[in-house]
């Protein structure tokens, strides 16, 4: 796990795989927050399994300088050393400077592959949107759940 922002550690990442989706407020302790760094999380499935999708729950709350991810990439590995990318998805920045507060469940589907380890990389947007009071400043990226199917 790439270290999150000191203020938003989410039990050192444990909340990412606890099966609980948080409400749309970043200060519940159930969100893991990143500022100017990518979320990089590795999930050990404890055994070889066939995997065909990964879901990543991310928060958008522009009033708190929080945007969802610019992109999410999913990698799989049998040994935890060599990873292969199986999916990558990019997202559009909100066009409304303040927008709504919401939690999005981003699903990345791919052909079923055997894996023991799943690496998820979520890249934040580089700047808040035009018209925002912090236009161009880096936003936070908040994630509260990663599900492997």
Which residues are covered by each model-predicted region?
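Selective for proline/serine-rich intrinsically disordered segments
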Residues: 1-2, 92, 112
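Predominantly extracellular/luminal regions of secreted and cell-surface proteins
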Residues: 1-22
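A broadly tuned preference for mixed-charge, low-complexity surface segments
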Residues: 6, 99-102
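Aromatic, loop-rich ligand-recognition surfaces of beta-strand-rich domains
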Residues: 22-87, 102-149
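Surface-exposed loop and turn segments in beta-propeller and other repeat-based domains
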Residues: 91-97
């Amino acid at each position: 796990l790439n270290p999150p922002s000191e203020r938003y550690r989410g039990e050192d990442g444990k909340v990412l795989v606890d099966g609980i989706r948080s409400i749309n407020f970043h200060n519940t302790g159930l969100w893991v927050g990143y500022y100017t760094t990518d979320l990089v999380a590795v999930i050990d499935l404890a055994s070889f399994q066939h995997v065909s999708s990964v879901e990543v729950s991310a928060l958008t709350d522009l009033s708190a300088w929080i945007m969802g991810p610019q992109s999410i990439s999913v990698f799989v590995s049998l040994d935890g050393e060599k990873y292969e990318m199986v999916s990558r998805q990019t997202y559009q920045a909100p066009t409304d400077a303040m927008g709504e507060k919401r939690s999005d469940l981003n699903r990345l589907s791919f052909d079923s592959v055997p894996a023991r380890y799943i690496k998820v990389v979520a890249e934040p947007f580089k700047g808040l949107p035009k018209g925002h009071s912090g236009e161009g400043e880096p936003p936070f990226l908040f994630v509260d759940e990663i599900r492997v199917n």
